[in-house]
Design a protein with these regions (language model features):
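Asp-box/BNR beta-propeller blade signature and adjacent active/binding-site loops
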Residues: 1-182
């Protein structure tokens, strides 16, 4: 749905499921994260699905016409034929980096945060990277792109990402971290 009067009234909602859910998907839904608008105007939201084997996969949906029509983007773990639980990826969040690339942070069964990068607006994704220093107790996380900062210690430019999730077992002990990507 949408509002064109600052939220005073809303249009009737439109079900986009038929536009984005493939036949092999048993379930398709959004995570609790927010969407992003790319530099070219594309609107993108992270979603996840299950296949016929009940295995989960992260992917994204996007609109290039202001939300009138929607398409499915790529998946870092090719959910249609996935069999291996250790490769499952579920709820996720997407941020846009300074160079225009997308970074997707994904919940998984691996016990650590998993990420992938797209250089083509989410149509394809890099191999996933597991970050051993960031615990993932299988709970939704949040990532927000902050911008580029200069490290006073070494003068290097570092792209800052504000990241939050539970820091230990279960859904407790929330922690907010500043992650950085070093610009070479």
């Amino acid at each position: 749905t949408y509002s064109d009067d600052d939220g005073e009234t809303w249009a009737n909602p439109t079900d986009i499921t038929p536009m984005v859910k493939a036949d092999w998907m048993k379930f398709c839904g959004t995570g609790p994260g927010a969407g992003v608008q790319l530099k070219n105007g594309t609107i993108m939201f992270p979603v996840y699905c299950t296949n016929g084997n009940g295995k989960q996969s992260s992917f994204n949906v996007y609109s290039t016409d202001g939300g009138k029509t929607w398409n499915s983007g790529g998946s870092p773990n090719n959910g249609g034929d996935m069999q291996n639980a250790s490769n499952e990826l579920t709820e996720s969040c997407i941020i846009t980096l300074d160079n225009g690339h997308l970074m997707q942070f994904m919940r998984s069964y691996n016990g650590v945060i998993t990420t992938a990068v797209s250089t083509d607006n989410g149509l394809t994704w890099s191999e996933t990277t597991k970050h051993s220093g960031i615990v993932d107790p299988y709970c939704q996380m949040s990532a927000v792109h902050y911008g580029t900062l200069t490290d006073p210690a070494d003068g290097r430019q570092k792209e800052a990402i504000i990241f939050s999730n539970p820091a230990g077992g279960g859904r407790k002990g929330g922690k907010v971290r500043i992650l950085s990507l070093i610009h070479i």
